[in-house]
A protein has these predicted regions:
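Short amphipathic alpha-helix that is part of the acyltransferase structural core
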Residues: 1-35, 139-174
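Conserved beta-strand-loop-alpha-helix junction that forms the acyl-donor binding cleft
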Residues: 104-110, 251-261, 278-282
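Conserved acetyl-CoA-binding loop of GNAT-fold acetyltransferases
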Residues: 119-125, 265-274
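A conserved beta-strand-loop-helix scaffold within acyl/acetyltransferase catalytic domains
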Residues: 40, 70-72, 173, 177-220
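Conserved acetyl-CoA-binding loop-helix of GNAT-fold acetyltransferases
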Residues: 83-93, 217, 221-223, 227-243, ...
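Recognition helices and adjacent regulatory flanks at domain boundaries
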Residues: 193-196, 206-209, 228-241, 248, ...
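Conserved donor-binding loop and adjoining core beta-sheet/short helix segment
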Residues: 3-12, 23-29, 36-102, 201-214
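Acyl-donor-binding surface of acyltransferase catalytic domains
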Residues: 63-65, 70-147, 278
Length: 282
């Protein structure tokens, strides 16, 4: 008998999605970081996104070897898949008459998905962001002195943390989307702040560790406070704190932003891969 075809299992429950992808998260924690942390957030706070969906790609033996996620209004996220597998899901969703704002993830797979999607569903695909993936293999070191000191955010900091996280997302995506708060991350001690002269001047947070890997994100210094190295200080200190807890660190950066890329590489992060975000339009 010929082998069974590659199949896609739709999952709409976050806890079930966690179970489906547990093996992949353990074996490919960096690639699955976004999917794993977002899925965790939906287990903790089910209303965080409306209508989330996951697809587990299974090979002929039934093993889950590919992972996809869609949390509207975000583009569909390809966590792990070959270009051929990505094209396969695009064909399935196009045939079902699905509607997607875009796709993001591994460069080759996202490009393959977009090509298949537009050929079947119509419209155009435009690259909106190119992203580098970085990991940390040494203890971070700031190559210059930064005024001030690091501390872990507490509950009283939550309003400021949420305000700055909104500003961080607005700077990347443009205004218009209200982002979920970081109250749980604050409660879990995963938000770092930098204070200087009695004033909080910068922040970053670490995702829950999945497969032993945490993702540093939300790095934000208000524009009027930049130029003092605060972002370097908070990222280095937060990364070191997570390393001390036995977690490996990674992060993503916009490749069009040479400043942030230079900052992270100076701290010891190294570029290990690329992702891409593509927007669909009619």
């Amino acid at each position: 008998m010929p082998p069974a075809p590659f199949t896609f299992e739709l999952v709409t429950d976050a806890a079930q999605a966690q179970a489906r992808f547990a093996g992949l998260v353990a074996s490919e924690p960096e690639a699955l970081s976004v999917l794993a942390s977002v899925t965790w957030s939906l287990v903790v706070e089910p209303g965080r996104y409306v209508g989330p969906r996951w697809w587990a790609g299974r090979d002929a033996s039934g093993e889950v070897v590919a992972a996809f996620m869609h949390t509207p209004p975000h583009p569909l996220h390809i966590a792990l898949a070959t270009p051929e597998q990505a094209r396969g899901l695009a064909a399935v969703l196009a045939e079902l008459g699905d509607r997607l704002p875009g796709v993001g993830g591994l460069r080759a797979s996202a490009e393959a998905f977009a090509q298949e999607w537009t050929s079947l569903a119509g419209g155009t695909a435009t690259v909106s962001m190119e992203v580098g993936r970085f990991d940390l293999t040494t203890r971070p070191r700031v190559p210059f002195e930064v005024p001030g000191a690091f501390r872990v955010a507490t509950g009283v900091d939550t309003p400021l943390v949420d305000e700055w996280n909104q500003q961080f997302v607005d700077a990347i995506e443009g205004p218009g989307r209200t982002v979920p708060g970081l109250e749980q991350q604050v409660a879990d001690g995963r938000v770092g702040l930098w204070d200087d002269d009695g004033r909080t001047v910068s922040m970053a947070y670490a995702s829950p560790a999945n497969g032993g890997v945490t993702r540093i994100s939300g790095v934000w210094t208000p524009p009027e406070l930049r130029g003092h190295g605060y972002a370097s200080g908070v990222v280095a200190a937060l990364s070191a704190a997570r390393l001390d807890q036995g977690e490996a660190c990674m992060l993503y950066t916009d490749l069009a932003n040479p400043t942030s890329n230079a900052i992270y590489q100076a701290l010891g992060y190294r570029r290990v891969g690329d992702s891409i975000s593509i927007t669909f339009s009619a």
